[in-house]
Amino acid sequence: MTNAAFLLLLTLTACVAPCPADAVGFEHLTPAKAAAEALRHRNKSKSKAFEDRFHPTYPSVCNVKKCAAREASACLRGAVMYQIFTRMFTPEGTFKAAERKLPELKELGVDIIYLTPHQLADDDQDPRFWSARQRKCGFGNPKNPYRQKDFYAVDPEYGSAQDLKDFVIAAHRLGMKVMFDLVYFHCGPKASFLTEHPDFIVRNPDGSPLLGEWAFPEMDISRREVRDYLYANMEGFVRDYDADGFRCDVADMLPVDFWEEGYLRCKALKPDFFMMCEGLKGDDQRLAFDLSYGFYTQWTMVELLKGAQPASVLRTAWEAQQRDYPKGFHWMRCFENHDFANVNPGEKRKEELYGHDLNAAMIATIFLLDGVPMLYNGQEIADASPQSIFSNRDHGGWHVDWTKADEPYALERRNLVKRLASIRHGNPDLFDAPVIWLETGAADRVYAFRRDLPGQPLTLAVNISAEPAAIRLEGTDVTVPPKSFVIRRGPNLQIDRKERKQ
């Protein structure tokens, strides 16, 4: 794209979701100072009450009460997302092995593959540059996919650059989109560009790298040369690999205008391009992002699985998101991903700790809430095998246990996901139709909401307790099984997790 074309595109889109500036904003600070200010803002109001966790992690430049999010990419309406953590998705941990499972994901109802980082990870052995959980896990694997040595190179652990291209081609042939993972806040201590460009990272007065929150050197995004280097990387993924979108790691630790320019550059190459933000900042969807992580509901569903909070807190979390973010904000809904599934040796996953039934109820919840639902590595077979960011075929050998995919509980889960995906595909307005929370008369045990859609409304009731819950739902007596759910279509048809109809 020429500079003139880019400037024209920037001018045409600059007025999307106008936001009057507030006094609060850190865009003018260096990345290091901005991160420090954001951390102080994030921790400024700590309390023992779980609900006090519901607030933006980072301050906004704009007044969220007067802002509006831009329109999201049309491909997200009715879509189902699936995260593949490549090194543990299959025993081989390669793109080729993952490619062979793409037809299964298509049959499941998946529309978008979110592929975790494929870039060359740094193999530096110095534990000073390892994150706390990297040291704690005990695998001794220096290669953290989120600590990268070369943003442009494909890590041979997963295969070749052509293998990655073939994966994308295969997904596209099946009608699925592929989203790559970008990690630009930091890099590895042996990053390939540091020899020629030592000024690409933030440095202390003595010249040593400034280490960020995860003990990795921080990229100096304040430098135009760094931005251009990363923009070329983004454009290359779209142009050379045909990536459809990006998930942006800890995106709010970088200035939002960095992401906005990157989005515009990529959208000029692919009109239906989209981006997802791992962050909680009101400015994020002004222009840069189509989706943000629904952390409020994500945290809450984990607490509900544990039995640590009453059912009513999910409504509190959802309403807090409506309060804290601009009109039209869109969320990715999940309760399991590579971070939340990460365990150390000897620890158990949610499926084993809290049971398949309640996990299924949470899956039904993310599919029927607004936004886009996302499944993670093997959730569709209720996989309980341990997962770690730092395990691969050479370190621990952990991976999804596909040998159990034909167990009765796995088949039941797969059938449930297929039915939920079918509901999602048949009702694209689930993306942004109003969520109407309902009184159940048992707020500590049961939450329920209705989605008013063209035709018949959809209602979900979830019982997080260990006993059946007899409730009155919009004038009808309904019994919700223990640690399970009921979906109602219209006034009469009722479906539970095994598709029994009443």
Go through each PLM region and give its residues.
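Substrate-binding/active-site clefts of carbohydrate-active enzymes
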Residues: 66-96, 102-111, 117-241, 261-269, ...
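Short, solvent-exposed turn/loop segments enriched in Gly/Ser/Thr/Pro and often Arg
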Residues: 114-123, 181-190, 249-255, 278-282, ...
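Structural preference for beta-strand elements that scaffold enzyme active sites
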Residues: 79-83, 112, 175-179, 243-247, ...
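Conserved, mostly hydrophobic/aromatic
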Residues: 84, 105, 115, 151, ...
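Loop/helix patches that line or flank the sugar-binding groove of alpha-linked glycan CAZymes
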Residues: 72, 76, 123, 325-470, ...
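Active-site-proximal helices and loops of the catalytic beta/alpha 8
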Residues: 26-32, 36-65, 239, 249-331, ...
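C-terminal beta-sandwich/jelly-roll accessory domains of carbohydrate-active enzymes
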Residues: 464-502
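Bacterial N-terminal signal peptides
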Residues: 5-14
